[in-house]
Amino acid sequence: LDSIPNITAEDIREHWRRTHTAGNLRFVVAGNFVGRIGQLREILNSFELGAGDRLPIAVDEMHSAPAFAIRRKDVPGIGLAISLVVPRKLSDAENEAMSLLNHILNGTLHSRIQGEARRRGLLYYMWSQLSTFEHNSSWDFGAQVSVSNLPAVVDLVTNEMQRVKDGLVDETELAEAKSYAMGRYQMGTQTVGQIAGWLADRYFFDGVIDDFSAVPARINAISPEQIIETARDIIRHNCWTLGLYGSTDKTMADQLYDRFAKLF
């Protein structure tokens, strides 16, 4: 924020020249192009952009951080966030494995964490997801929880992650997660918007055009062992933090941080 007053018009022009080039441009167009391919190419080739280069993605040095709390007295519930980072780009198989694990943990009303937390009246909704970047990947959890239920929710998350770490993923729950993933796959390209979104999700990131027809084989190839080892590797790196948002304080965040630290 302190640097904002120092930005000049020339800084903006230089940024534009460096970033708005054909080499740094990525886009996806989806639809019925029968008889219109030539017109589309003409439009795309009319862009007045220099050749340029694809700009590299910066490498950040990742490390654990202390607990944090963003205090907002006007927010009644508490936003809970937990993030674990591994300093590498996970493979397609590892991404698929973690997607299935996240479904087992938080994907349904019968899932290990969200389902159990709802059954016990601890929260209404909790999510988890795996995000892969060029130089690191993160496994993130989030929920909206009342102050009184925070310790129980963090203990539940910790215990279920420990169970995975201990190798407790069975074929039955994996089969259910695969069935859900196959249904999501079958419904994933019913509109041109979905097709464009599917392709863009990967292509914008690393230039790979994902083979939609190969997805079922990728899903079916995942074993409990693959899930367990991928989760263990993320936990093994011990690079994480926990934070709160709402009408709470740093003391509560520190206490929850210590509870979750038992996983490591």
Language-model features and meaning:
Residues 1-54, 89, 97, 119-264:
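Charge-rich, well-structured scaffold segments of protease-associated domains
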Residues 52-111, 121:
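His/Glu-based metal-binding/catalytic segments typifying zinc-dependent metallopeptidases
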